[in-house]
Structures are given as C-alpha cells and as structure tokens.
C-alpha cells in the first residue's frame, strides 16, 4: 500500500509497497479518507520521542477517518461501506492500569494507528460509525475533539467566567469554540502568530494578544 513513512529524523518519504497491516479477527480494515497532522507527528519528524520511543520505519498520522473495507471474523456490527472514525490508541486491556481505567498509562500499548497510509486495521472497539450528518473530513477531528472535551471536564467551566487560551493550534482552536459554547463571558487568546490571532477573532475570541 501507499504510505508516508518516517525512517528517522527528517527522513520521510512516500512509499508505494509498504506492507498492509494484518486484519485480526476482532479488527476492522479501513480505507483512510482523511488524517489530521498532529503535533506529535511533528515531534517524531524532529526526532523527538513521545511517551514511547519511535520505532522506524513507521507511517505517521493517527487522527483518521475512513470507510470500512473488510471486517474480521468476530466483527458483526460493521460492514464494508460504513463510514467511521477511529480512536487511535491501542491498549492491552490486561495490565493493572487498563484494569483500573487508566488506559493512558498502559504498560503494553501497541501504539497508535498509522493514518498516513491507505489502510489501517484497528480493533473493533476503537472504531465508531458516523452519522450521515457528519462528513469524513470533519470526523478526522474526533480524536483531538475528544481530548478537548476531557479537558473541559477537568476545567469545570462556570457560566460567566473568563478563560485564557495560550496557543491557537488545532487544540487551542477547538478549546476556544467549546469555551464559548459552555458560557464563558470572555475568551482571551495568547498567540504569537498574527494569522492565528485573526483566526481567533473569527472564532469568537474576546481579545487576542501577542
């Protein structure tokens, strides 16, 4: 399959014969339609590891949406042609952390889906069927949106409060919109790039500072 593959720091190329991921009995083969570019991808490109070392060669990308091509033998509730979004994180489900609801600390994580490729094969439990009203393009933002929604839960924003958002990348942009919808009286953005400050004002920021 075709994939955008990272071979090392600043060593990235499009390959046309990268091996397709195997389809396990509880997995779903998806033809990727859209995949977002995350800050984590940039860090890997720059040779910086995240929570785990980067093992080369590896396709980047994990904020993916697409169309089901095939399902494993144990999957009964999805079929070819279904439009889906993906939770990119694969957990072992057996370590102490997974058993106690702390999957983000999984000791045996299989990593994340590799969305800058033609196909991915995540477990069924990581695949979410999309409503007809949601485009595949927008659905690629499901993973960063879920991160922001968790942040909103932790923030416990009250109507009428003022919020300061530092940085207006994709996460900051989503937070700005969520805070406005949650009833923040003022949303102040701190962002060094003029173009992004303009975006902040268009998204409803009360004030954008350099």
Segments from the language model and where they lie:
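NAD(P)H dinucleotide-binding glycine-rich loop of Rossmann-like/cofactor-binding domains
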Residues: 90-166
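Glycine-rich beta-strand-centered segment in the early N-terminal region that forms part
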Residues: 20-35, 49-96, 131-134
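Mid-domain Rossmann-like dinucleotide-binding core that forms the NAD(H)/NADP(H) cofactor-binding site
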Residues: 135-210
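Residues that mark the start of a beta-strand
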Residues: 2, 27-29, 162
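Cytochrome P450 core scaffold surrounding the K-helix E-X-X-R motif
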Residues: 40-46
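Short N-terminal binding/cap micro-motifs at the start of the first secondary-structure element
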Residues: 10-15, 39-40
């Amino acid at each position: 399959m075709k994939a955008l593959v990272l071979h090392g720091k600043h060593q990235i190329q499009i390959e046309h014969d990268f091996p397709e991921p195997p389809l396990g009995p509880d997995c779903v083969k998806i033809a990727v339609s859209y995949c977002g570019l995350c800050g984590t991808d940039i860090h890997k490109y720059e040779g910086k590891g995240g929570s785990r070392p980067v093992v080369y060669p590896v396709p980047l990308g994990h904020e993916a949406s697409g169309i089901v091509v095939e399902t494993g033998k144990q999957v009964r509730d999805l079929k070819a042609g279904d439009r889906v979004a993906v939770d990119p994180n694969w957990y072992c489900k057996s370590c102490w952390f997974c058993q106690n609801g702390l999957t983000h600390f999984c000791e045996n994580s299989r990593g994340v889906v590799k969305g800058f490729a033609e196909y991915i094969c995540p477990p069924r439990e990581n695949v979410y069927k999309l409503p007809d009203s949601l485009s595949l393009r927008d659905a690629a933002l499901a993973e960063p949106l879920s991160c922001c929604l968790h942040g909103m839960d932790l923030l416990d924003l009250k109507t009428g409060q003022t919020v300061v958002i530092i940085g207006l990348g994709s996460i900051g942009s989503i937070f700005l919109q969520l805070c406005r919808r949650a009833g923040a009286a003022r949303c102040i953005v701190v962002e060094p790039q003029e173009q992004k400050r303009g975006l902040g004002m268009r998204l409803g920021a009360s004030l954008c500072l350099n």
